Amino acid sequence: MCGIVGYAGKRSAQDVLLDGLEKLEYRGYDSAGVALAQEGGIRVVKSKGRLDALRQKLAVQALAESSCGIGHTRWATHGEPSDVNSHPHSTPRVSIVHNGIIENYGALKERLAARGYTFESETDTEVLVKLIDSCYHGEPLQALHEALGMVRGSYALAVLFKDFPDTIFAVKKESPLIVGWGEGENFVASDIPALLKYPRDYSVLEEGDLAVVTAQGIRFYNAFGEPVERQRLTADWDQEAAEKGGYPHFMLKEINEQPAAITATVSPRVEDGMPDLRIPELTDERLRSIGTVHLVACGTAMHAGMVGKAAIETLARVPAEVDIASEFRYRDPILNKDDLVIIISQSGETSDTLAALKLAKSRGVPVLAIVNVVGSSIARAADYILYTYAGPEIAVASTKAYVVQMCVLYLFALRLAYARGKLEEAETKRLTAELLRAGEVIKPRLDDCEQIKYLASRFVNTQSCFFIGRGFDYALSLEGSLKLKEISYVHSDAYAAGELKHGTISLITDGVPVIALATQKQVYEKTISNAKETKSRGARVILFTTKDAVVPEGVADYIVRLDEYEDLLMPLQLIVPLQLFAYYMAVLRGCDVDKPRNLAKSVTVE
């Protein structure tokens, strides 16, 4: 959730750190700070609030030039947002920034207090830096090994020692951390976008790794303190992809990038008109042996999993289950050796999802990961990988990553159905061709947004909103509702339309907007009937349906018409106006679209 940046080299460390932290703002934060190695000691400057507040403090203090330092954006877990709780935390000899949670910090704090240490903040990180200080006798590696041996929890650390002013010590346990390779300069970061302005080569720290980073090079040690080598990767995202490119917000840019993201993700996986997963080990024979598919994810990725479940069961007639990752890992799921667990995560670092993956593997069940970041923790741990090629997604609210997650799940469902003899080759090719043109299908929704803007202006002051739908439309109701409440702060709930009479309809009051999704022909009349029920109780109904659908008079106040498209694939088109509705509602309400309050892009702690 928090952001870490470290730099050792020839440039101004302060400038590099601030630039890197700005690139990590999408991860969410409530305070920020830097520690700079200078002659005579380590200078720490930190501030509650946005990076601008930190910049102002730095400008006033006018620190001496430094070429080595660490920086941090904090999302509060222990201790409220404040200057004193912000990172870095320091002693006269050691300064650290930390992502993660130290579970036994209370017991460690008592032990350190008995030795004379005092504490100013409420954070687990202050306990950790003083624990490291208590173990330091001139050898940083020894101090870190001894201190971290007493710690229970997760952490990504960047550490400065006063006695080693040109060196950053980076340590990783259950929280993501990478190091970047430059020429006469090297970097530490919690995510790739912080490095895109600089040389693109990076290495991912593995579990228990410690990296010693100087301007001259990087050395790696494993959890046992043994020197090791780590694979050097190259980021294929360009810097412009992580910029707004003329759009007022990253979210709007990323919504408009969806056609290109679909093409980039689907096209390489189609061979002679047939879906080809490009995973040699996942043969048709292996696909035929699958018992149950378990789709596990959090938030928006879980909503993509719901679409995947429906596609898998509809096309391949294989039972599929969808689980919220944080529930899956604690409910003792029934898993069999012939099952397949599909893990879905944009970042590849989502804490609960990674834990669910580890649970599946501990039961001997193979795992297929759908992720957007090469070399991420989930990608490295999975048996099979399907990368989505969305490029960097900076806005906290996911849009293009969600769409390509659905695309990959459609490809998987199509290949699974063909391998198991549930789809003939001709029908498989037809549906694959329809999927290939999805980018073309959604483009008109992006080119003409006036109706959606108008609807947002009509309902900008609403206090509550309800989404209803059936089948695929219900899965889209959940995602549309989530987008609206994430970024516009309007209370919103989504329900299976058939559940209205089981309690939900009591919430319908005069003037409340109900967004009814009715794109599925099989259940169209049922959904229309449900929409009419809400209308008769005073709701203002916004109906999303297809151009050819016959809408009875008096059902809806507003109708948004979509192009005719394959029912199975309609979520790819329907989601676009729902994303845009949430976006324009947020803009009109004056909300921070890209960085909504209290939310983080990558949830790397439980």
Predicted regions and their residues:
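Conserved short alpha-helical segments that host acidic/polar catalytic motifs at enzyme active sites
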Residues: 1-244, 248-249, 257-292, 330, ...
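A SIS-like phosphosugar-recognition module
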Residues: 163-164, 175-177, 183, 202-246, ...
